[in-house]
């Protein structure tokens, strides 16, 4: 598909329509594969956040919630299914925008759009099922009382999302929030906002009630921070860096506001000596080089049994050399650019520091020689790593994998858990009992056995330790946006009898 001659010029999507940012400022959109400026996005500030939150608040309570927050789940499901259908219709165009905006291979972006549509469809089904789960009875020990549970939308939610999977990560929050009956203000990363703005256009096309979903773009300090601190936002859901997540927690704590956080990771991949090496190498590659390694759950710490380490690394280098690194619009591209010049410089500094600290750059670590422009980095394999090195301890968020050897299962688990993070982990072995033991021992919210990075909308996603808390996807993702209310009634015709009635005069 040919690149469009111009990126659509969008405003902020507030109250069901487009409006220019209050200060009239816009931010350039740079194609990271070419370094060319291809358009711009509106730069929202606190005044725009106020308008968006007000629109969401109005939509939540309009006509007592009859049109959205208190409407039957089947009503909300109709809109979610309509959004999914539009995503499918526009799949090729949206994938192209995503590639131009973020630098990811077009094939990957197209797969992301399929996942976006599937996520909206899944939560449409859960919205419909929610009606049948209301008034769930609670068994009580006293016959003169009856009790049941209502699940109600938590209110207006602020959704702050990252740039690595721009529309998909937004959908992981938008779809369950809307299914629950919440109204929302979505603030995507300023580094990749184009497809999220197109979601606003889709909402307008399908007639989503005004204010149910509002989309503002801009800098984190100017748009994200006012959203996180707004007193009329009932919950914040954030995916991004651990440092930003800490600031959001501090802000929310001042108002006792619930938050869910999906933050950084430094996930391990443990490979034992009983594996098919080429199969395991491909999973190691996919676990750290897909999406140019810009994945929060990337298995960027590779732990190899000492008996196979040399053979494994020889094959890993051979496979890494075979990756097609190119303009992400080219057919067969498997490694595009990273998202921005800032991210490029950050990754290159990690590699430089690893070298200075005594690690070995076994392969990669530089710009591909055939690509003179764009923010491209070769797949990078780093060995002779100690556990005190920055490359072992900190999230790189790029196509960089560091390697250590182990001798025993116990040592492998200790190395795997030697991190402040706890998002994911993986183990590859033909001994399934060993895999089960390790899946219990790894301190993370997700464990993969004989694979790395599969993600299904039906299964919970989230981490432990400094990787955050709360779970997205599946029923757990819907529960993020629901408040549980207990309703108990007294059913006897007799007085309760706790107090003695006053004497009759």
From Swiss-Prot:
In which organism is this protein found?
Answer: Oryza sativa subsp. japonica
pH influence on activity: Optimum pH is 9.5.
Domain of life where this protein originates: Eukaryota
Q: Which SUPFAM superfamilies match?
A: ALDH-like
Work out whether the entry's keyword set contains NAD: yes
Name assigned to this protein: Betaine aldehyde dehydrogenase 1
Q: What GO molecular function terms would the record report?
A: betaine-aldehyde dehydrogenase (NAD+) activity
Q: What is its EC number?
A: 1.2.1.8
Signal sequence bounds: none
Q: Which residues form the active site?
A: 262, 296
Q: Which gene is transcribed and translated to give this protein?
A: BADH1
The UniProt keyword set, sorted, is:
NAD, Oxidoreductase, Peroxisome
The record's comment on protein family reads: Belongs to the aldehyde dehydrogenase family.
Q: In which pathway does it act?
A: Amine and polyamine biosynthesis; betaine biosynthesis via choline pathway; betaine from betaine aldehyde: step 1/1
Q: Where is this motif: Microbody targeting signal?
A: 503-505
> Subunit structure of this entry?
Homodimer.
Residues recorded as binding betaine aldehyde, renumbered to this chain, are 163-172, 262, 294-297, 455
């Amino acid at each position: 598909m040919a690149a469009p001659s111009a990126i659509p010029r969008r405003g902020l999507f507030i109250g069901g329509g487009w409006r220019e940012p209050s200060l009239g400022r816009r931010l350039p959109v740079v194609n990271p594969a070419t370094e060319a400026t291809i358009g711009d996005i509106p730069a929202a500030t606190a005044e725009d956040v106020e308008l968006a939150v007000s629109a969401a608040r109005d939509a939540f309570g309009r006509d007592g919630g009859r049109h959205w927050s208190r409407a039957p789940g089947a009503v909300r499901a109709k809109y979610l299914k309509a959004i999914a259908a539009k995503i499918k219709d526009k799949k090729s165009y949206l994938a192209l925008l995503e590639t131009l905006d973020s630098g990811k291979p077009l094939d990957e972006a197209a797969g992301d759009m399929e996942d976006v549509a599937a996520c909206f469809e899944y939560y449409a089904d859960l919205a419909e099922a929610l009606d049948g789960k209301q008034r769930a009875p609670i068994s009580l020990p006293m016959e003169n009382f009856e009790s049941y549970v209502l699940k109600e939308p938590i209110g207006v939610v602020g959704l702050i999302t990252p740039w690595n999977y721009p529309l998909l990560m937004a959908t992981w929050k938008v779809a369950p929030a809307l299914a629950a009956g919440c109204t929302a203000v979505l603030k995507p990363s300023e580094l990749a906002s184009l497809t999220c703005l197109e979601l606003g256009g889709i909402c307008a096309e399908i007639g989503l009630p005004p204010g149910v979903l509002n989309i503002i773009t801009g800098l984190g300090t100017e748009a994200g921070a006012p959203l996180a601190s707004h007193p009329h936002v009932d919950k914040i859901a954030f995916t991004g860096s651990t440092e930003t997540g800490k600031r959001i927690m501090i802000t929310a704590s001042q108002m006792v506001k619930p938050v869910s956080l999906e933050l950084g990771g430094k996930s391990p991949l443990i490979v034992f000596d009983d594996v098919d090496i080429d199969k395991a190498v491909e999973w190691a590659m996919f676990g750290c080089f897909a999406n140019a390694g810009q994945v929060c759950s990337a298995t960027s710490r590779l732990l190899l049994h000492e008996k196979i380490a040399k053979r494994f690394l020889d094959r890993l280098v051979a496979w890494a050399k075979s990756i097609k690194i190119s303009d992400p619009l080219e057919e067969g591209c498997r490694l595009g650019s990273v998202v921005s010049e800032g991210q490029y410089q950050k990754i290159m500094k990690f590699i430089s520091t690893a070298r200075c600290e005594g690690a070995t750059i076994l392969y990669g670590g530089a710009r591909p020689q055939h690509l003179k422009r764009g923010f491209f980095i070769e797949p990078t394999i780093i060995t002779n790593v100690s556990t005190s090195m920055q490359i072992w301890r900190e999230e790189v968020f790029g196509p960089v994998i560091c390697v250590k050897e182990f001798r025993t299962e116990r040592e492998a688990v200790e190395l795997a858990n030697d991190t402040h993070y706890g998002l994911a982990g993986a183990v590859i072995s033909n001994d399934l009992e060993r895999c089960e033991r390790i899946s219990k021992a790894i301190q993370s919210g997700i464990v993969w056995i004989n694979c790395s990075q599969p993600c299904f909308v039906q299964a919970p996603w989230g981490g432990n330790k400094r990787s955050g808390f709360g779970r997205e996807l599946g029923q757990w993702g819907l529960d993020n946006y629901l408040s549980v209310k207990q309703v108990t009634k007294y059913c006897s015709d007799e007085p309760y009898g706790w107090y003695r009635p006053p004497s009759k005069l």
